[in-house]
């Protein structure tokens, strides 16, 4: 039995049941609301970090030294409010599926509840002064990708509370003459009060704990253990597994995990650069470039192989069009259009290859470099947007072996993703074919037409 047949017979039926669950669908559909904004932001990100010699100097000469900061304005405006958009979108989609509560009211209430979980203060330390707490501000990190997991939980919780209260008829109904928009607002009063009361209790409970706030609790529970495993092969494997799992749950795995192990990687990179400049053996394999350029071709999950199949082998028009949209980003190692476009978030079909592929690439790449078959990263800092093959050559200090390893890794990505891509593509093609079939019309008797 082929791999594809095995997947279609055993994996797909279970995946269909999971994927059809209301809450799973709502999370996926709600997060997709970010996609057009992130696509726009990704193009500006590419232009800000084009890996062309002399490009940065040219732009500085034309637009000034701060040109890149200004180019990143759209990136910050699109990427940094992901959790806000998702909190509204998930609740809206879940309310749509229940059909018993107003989706717009549910989305707005979820947004309010999510904002209420965020501490509205931040610690500010002047250059020549003492640290002080600034009140009345919302940290951008809390409403961006780092707050996405909290947004998912709160949006599902608030909508379920809203539905439960409304189903008990604990609502204020206005007379028939009141405009519908006003009537819906009053219907949301009591359910909304209950939602905020529960979320307030949750926030107070977490604030009474050593964590202080919900986002800090997640960062502490996940991040501190990762700090102790930074530069080892087992630690690297654990890191990419955790990153992948978090992404499939809708949480920005890189933003959470890398913030704790990046200091180790950057320190290794600095030591590698010193050794490279002095003509000494490179001491470390695992650095920031090792992860960015060999483990994540096409972005987190090594999605470049999947994008290639979508461009060249898709029978589904949806997959083919998404491949065309995601290809420029994948070429520059930006995976968000794929993660939120297919989507890979809460998608059991792609859970296994999304986790397995980076693990295999870590093992293969580490072994190749440890045995001397491939030159390790020389400590040369390259932006993560540097395209494959160019990056392999530059990061190793001009060794062809870096390119060869990237070819091998891309091949592994193609092999692992292929059966899952084929099964998903067949499913989407069948759905498109079914939706294209003419619907049977029902001819009513003359008496029923009046």
Kindly give the residue locations of the regions a language model identified:
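Short, membrane-interfacial amphipathic segments enriched in basic
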Residues: 1-21, 60, 167-175, 210-215, ...
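Transmembrane alpha-helical segments and their short flanking loops
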Residues: 2-18, 53, 57-69, 273-282, ...
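Early transmembrane hairpin of solute transport permeases
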Residues: 20-172, 345
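Helix-loop-helix hairpins and the membrane-proximal interhelical loops
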Residues: 22, 30, 36, 46-72, ...
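Hydrophobic core segments of alpha-helical transmembrane domains in multi-pass membrane transport
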Residues: 34-49, 85-93, 109-121, 150-163, ...
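Membrane-interfacial segments
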Residues: 48-51, 55-56, 94-102, 165-174, ...
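Alpha-helical membrane segments and immediately flanking helix-loop junctions
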Residues: 84-94, 108, 112, 278-349, ...
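Membrane-interface helix-loop-helix junctions at boundaries between adjacent transmembrane segments
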Residues: 103, 121-234
């Amino acid at each position: 039995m082929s791999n594809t047949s095995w997947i279609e017979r055993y994996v797909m039926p279970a995946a269909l049941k999971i994927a059809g669950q209301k809450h799973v669908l709502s999370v996926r559909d709600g997060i997709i609301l970010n996609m057009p904004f992130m696509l726009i932001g990704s193009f500006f990100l590419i232009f800000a970090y084009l890996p062309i010699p002399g490009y940065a100097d040219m732009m500085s000469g034309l637009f000034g030294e701060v040109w890149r900061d200004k180019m990143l304005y759209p990136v910050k405006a699109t990427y940094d409010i992901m959790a806000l958009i998702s909190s509204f979108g998930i609740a809206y989609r879940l309310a749509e599926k229940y059909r018993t509560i107003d989706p717009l009211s549910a989305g707005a209430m979820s947004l309010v509840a999510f904002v209420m979980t965020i501490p509205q203060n931040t610690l500010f330390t002047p250059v020549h002064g003492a640290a002080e707490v600034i009140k009345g501000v919302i940290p951008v990190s809390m409403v961006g990708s780092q707050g996405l997991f909290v947004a998912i939980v709160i949006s599902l919780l608030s909508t379920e509370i809203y539905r439960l209260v409304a189903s008990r008829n604990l609502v204020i109904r206005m007379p028939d003459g009141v405009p519908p928009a006003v009537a819906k607002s009053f219907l949301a009063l009591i359910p909304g009060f209950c939602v905020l009361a529960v979320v307030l209790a949750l926030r107070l409970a977490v604030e009474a704990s050593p964590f202080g706030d919900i986002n800090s609790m997640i960062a502490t529970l996940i991040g501190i253990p990762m700090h102790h495993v930074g530069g080892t092969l087992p630690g690297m494997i654990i890191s990419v597994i955790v990153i992948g799992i978090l992404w499939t749950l809708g949480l920005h795995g890189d933003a959470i995990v890398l913030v704790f192990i990046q200091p180790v990687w950057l320190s290794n990179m600095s030591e590698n650069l010193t050794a490279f400049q002095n003509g000494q053996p490179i001491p470390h394999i695992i650095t920031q470039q090792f992860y960015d350029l060999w483990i994540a071709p096409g972005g987190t999950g090594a999605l470049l192989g999947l994008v290639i199949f979508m461009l060249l082998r898709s029978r589904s028009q949806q997959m083919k069009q998404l491949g065309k949209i995601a290809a420029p980003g994948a070429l520059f190692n930006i995976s968000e259009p794929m993660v939120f476009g297919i989507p890979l978030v809460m998608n059991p079909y792609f859970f296994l290859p999304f986790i397995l592929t980076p693990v295999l690439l870590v093992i293969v790449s580490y072994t190749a470099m440890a045995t001397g078959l491939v030159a390790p990263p020389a400590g040369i800092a390259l932006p993560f947007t540097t395209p494959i093959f160019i990056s392999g050559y530059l990061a190793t200090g001009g060794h062809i072996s870096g390119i060869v390893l990237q070819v091998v890794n891309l091949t592994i990505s193609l092999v692992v993703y292929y059966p899952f891509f084929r099964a998903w593509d067949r499913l989407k093609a069948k759905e498109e074919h079914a939706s294209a079939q003419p619907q049977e019309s029902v001819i009513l008797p003359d008496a029923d037409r009046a």
